[in-house]
């Protein structure tokens, strides 16, 4: 387990093991490391028949270099597109559920939402009515400086609540705030909100057309070679982005 999530990870593993054994699985079918360390992780990799590595580039590289069959899961930077054909209530609810589960730690949760300009205000109103807080320009700048520090994701915001991240940024938000939303324009790597944030912090973009929305989504996914895909809440046929 990750050192910062050791206790809850082990508790979850114990529950799954107990349920598996009660259902007839062999004792010890699920195991864990009580005191995690890089040395122990490398030892387990050398002894395993197959490795599923979820984590940063270092973890994935170590798995691929172990000499054993390995599946690596790296970072994700999932954008969602909401266009005119979408059910706005469903789209917003789905994003909020995804972004607040485990305080946004799942790498497949949305990191950005791209909204067509003619429904932008309606989508913004729906987010706000459901406990999401839209940062003003000054607040957006403060949160920017908290998301990325020295070119890397700030570990202090990972898995934290929106209120805690606001506090770290020097921003005051209403009690019960679910997500901090920054309205930004750039999808470039220089924009902190364009990165994977692993927390209830969301970037919101305005698109002039569906093609513009797709272009923004493609850039968000590709500028760091993220692999977790994107999500489209429109009711249209799926097609190849390269066509």
What are these regions (language model features)?
Residues 32-34, 110-115, 228-237:
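Conserved short loop/turn motifs at secondary-structure junctions
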Residues 19, 60-188:
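ALDH superfamily catalytic-core signature
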Residues 1-90:
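Rossmann-like NAD(P) dinucleotide-binding subdomain of oxidoreductase/dehydrogenase enzymes
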Residues 27-31, 109, 177-179, 227-228:
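Residue-level recognition of the N-termini of beta-strands and the immediately preceding loop/turn
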Residues 14, 49, 68-69, 128-130, ...:
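Short, solvent-exposed amphipathic alpha-helical segments in soluble enzyme
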Residues 30, 51, 116, 165, ...:
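Residue-level signal for inorganic ion chemistry
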């Amino acid at each position: 387990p990750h050192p910062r999530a050791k206790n809850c990870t082990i508790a979850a593993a114990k529950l799954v093991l107990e349920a598996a054994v009660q259902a007839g699985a062999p004792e010890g079918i699920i195991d864990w490391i009580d005191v995690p360390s890089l040395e122990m992780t490398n030892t387990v990799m050398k002894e395993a028949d197959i490795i599923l590595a979820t984590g940063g580039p270092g973890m994935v590289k170590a798995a691929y270099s172990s000499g054993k069959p390995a599946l690596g899961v790296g970072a994700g930077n999932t954008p969602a597109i909401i266009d005119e054909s979408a059910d706005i209530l469903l789209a917003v609810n789905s994003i909020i559920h995804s972004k607040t589960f485990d305080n946004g730690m799942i790498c497949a949760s949305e990191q950005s939402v791209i909204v067509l300009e003619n429904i932008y205000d309606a989508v913004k109103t729906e987010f706000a009515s459901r406990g999401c807080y839209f940062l003003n320009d000054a607040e957006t700048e403060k949160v920017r400086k908290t998301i990325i520090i020295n070119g890397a994701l700030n570990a202090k915001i990972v898995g934290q609540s929106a209120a805690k991240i606001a506090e770290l940024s020097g921003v005051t938000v209403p009690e019960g705030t679910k997500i901090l939303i920054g309205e930004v324009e750039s999808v470039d790597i220089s924009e902190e909100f364009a990165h994977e944030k692993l927390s209830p912090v969301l970037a919101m973009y305005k698109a002039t057309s569906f093609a513009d929305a797709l272009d923004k989504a493609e850039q968000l996914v590709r500028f760091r070679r993220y692999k977790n895909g994107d999500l489209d809440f429109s009711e249209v046929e799926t097609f190849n982005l390269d066509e």
